[in-house]
């Protein structure tokens, strides 16, 4: 059981036994952290889960209190809704939002990648030079699908170090994670098929569904505990679902990580209905220190989970190198890649081989995790100071996204448009859903150092939000 889960269960037992009574104030995050030996982010995650389940309530700057009516927290909650969209049409809106972010003077809180200054450009450039000098004549042929054998072996060994058995033969190197995910989707579906996605979901998933002519079954997803398995099963029972596109670690945009127990149950559910799972796992290397996470594939012994990831978030975005551990569909994915992009850049694959064998990657990851944790914590604290109590700031352990929930009558798209006038980019909730359910939400990138420029930008954004709340 994960550390945050142990704390959740411990506090539930204490509440049930009467140690904590309705209305009692729980220990502060810092005090609980010192008492339990857990990090502040782990304690915060546990408290947020208790709040989502109705055990506690929170007030900004006032801490957490035991809920006034505990009985209601033990009653089964209504399962999250499932919505369906027969014609996905979202790409044009997403394109417009992303285009606006390309302005070089823009402060990109809506950016999907980490702060580029965090990338190890010097060492990657050295690896690229070494790769160019030592590239054999046969490089082009050696790097055709499924991709460079050395690189696939390195990736397989990294999984093996976590206890995940993946053969290099089932790994296909792709031009970024999105190609890996889209090829996986093509291997499982035909135009007109139903695909389960989270709601909210990574907008790239919605774009891929639109491009491939697929129908979406959006399963409402809790910001803290993740996808509702009862609702997922209902979707699998009522529709002929051909695939599930899911994120179990540091989900974009919400930031949650499924517990290992829930991951196991999710895989068992997919196996029961014989539905392949396409797992988007691009953020799993960005966990807090000493708090590693496992992909859904870890719990799948039937090869029905297609594990997709990349180096774009953890190393450097511009390389555009990803992969899919495609299980029993590896050959089909290779054929599809051969018909579309033919192959992934051979020089870039060789660059990664040189870099990853130099042992610089682990040192870089350690520093990256530390800086992301520090920057996200500081930005979370500042947002809690700047924003009124009607705005819920959800900041969970790992990766670098913060999710803001505004009152439901607020249109985050209007806030986005006003912020653009101040050269501030944010990601409005509309980008991540095919319904209007998250139109009052905002995703922020917390990977940037909070210097005067970024602090000023957050103050401007907070002023815009307060103005909308006052209307």
Set out the residue ranges of the language-model regions:
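Conserved glycine-rich beta-strand-loop-beta hairpin in the small C-terminal domain of fold type I
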Residues: 370-380, 392-405
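Conserved core of the PLP fold type I
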Residues: 138-273, 278, 285-286, 291-300, ...
């Amino acid at each position: 059981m994960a550390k945050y889960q142990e704390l959740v269960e411990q506090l539930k037992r204490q509440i049930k036994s009467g140690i904590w009574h309705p209305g009692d104030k729980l220990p502060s995050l810092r005090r609980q952290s010192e008492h339990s030996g857990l990090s502040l982010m782990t304690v915060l995650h546990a408290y947020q889960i208790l709040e989502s389940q109705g055990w506690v309530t929170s007030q900004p700057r006032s801490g957490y209190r035991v809920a006034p009516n505990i009985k209601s927290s033990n009653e089964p909650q209504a399962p999250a809704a499932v919505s369906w969209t027969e014609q996905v049409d979202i790409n044009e809106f997403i394109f417009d939002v992303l285009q606006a972010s390309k302005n070089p003077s823009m402060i990109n809180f809506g950016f999907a990648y980490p702060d580029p200054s965090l990338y190890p450009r010097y060492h990657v450039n050295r690896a690229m030079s070494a790769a160019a000098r030592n590239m054999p004549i046969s490089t082009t042929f050696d790097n055709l699908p499924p991709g460079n054998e050395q690189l696939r072996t390195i990736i397989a060994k990294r999984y093996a170090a976590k206890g995940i058995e993946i053969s290099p033969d089932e790994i296909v190197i792709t031009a970024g994670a999105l190609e890996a995910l889209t090829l996986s989707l093509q291997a499982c579906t035909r135009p007109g098929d139903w695909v389960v996605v989270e709601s909210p979901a990574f907008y790239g998933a919605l774009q891929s569904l639109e491009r491939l002519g697929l129908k979406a079954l959006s399963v409402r997803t809790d910001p803290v505990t993740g996808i509702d398995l009862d609702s997922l099963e209902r979707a699998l029972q009522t529709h002929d679902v051909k695939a599930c596109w899911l994120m179990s670690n540091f989900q974009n945009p919400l930031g949650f990580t499924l517990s290992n127990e829930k991951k196991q149950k999710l895989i068992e559910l997919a196996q029961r209905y014989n539905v392949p799972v396409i797992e988007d796992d691009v953020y799993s290397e960005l966990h807090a220190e000493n708090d590693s996470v496992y992909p859904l594939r870890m719990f799948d012994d039937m090869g029905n989970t297609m594990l997709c990831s990349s180096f774009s978030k953890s190393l450097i975005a511009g390389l555009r190198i990803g992969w899919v551990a495609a299980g029993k569909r590896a050959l089909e994915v290779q054929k599809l890649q051969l018909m579309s992009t033919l192959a992934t850049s051979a020089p870039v694959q060789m660059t990664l081989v040189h870099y990853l064998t130099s042992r610089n990657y682990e040192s870089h990851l350690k520093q990256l995790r530390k800086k992301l944790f520090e920057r996200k914590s500081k930005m979370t604290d500042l947002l809690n100071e700047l924003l009124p109590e009607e705005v819920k700031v959800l900041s969970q352990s790992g990766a670098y996204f913060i999710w803001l929930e505004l009152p439901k009558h607020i249109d985050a798209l209007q806030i986005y448009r006003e912020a653009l006038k101040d050269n501030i980019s944010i990601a409005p909730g509309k980008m991540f859903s095919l319904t209007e359910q998250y139109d009052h939400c905002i995703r922020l990138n917390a990977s940037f150092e909070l210097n005067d420029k970024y602090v000023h930008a957050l103050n401007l954004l907070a002023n815009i939000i307060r103005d909308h709340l006052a209307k």
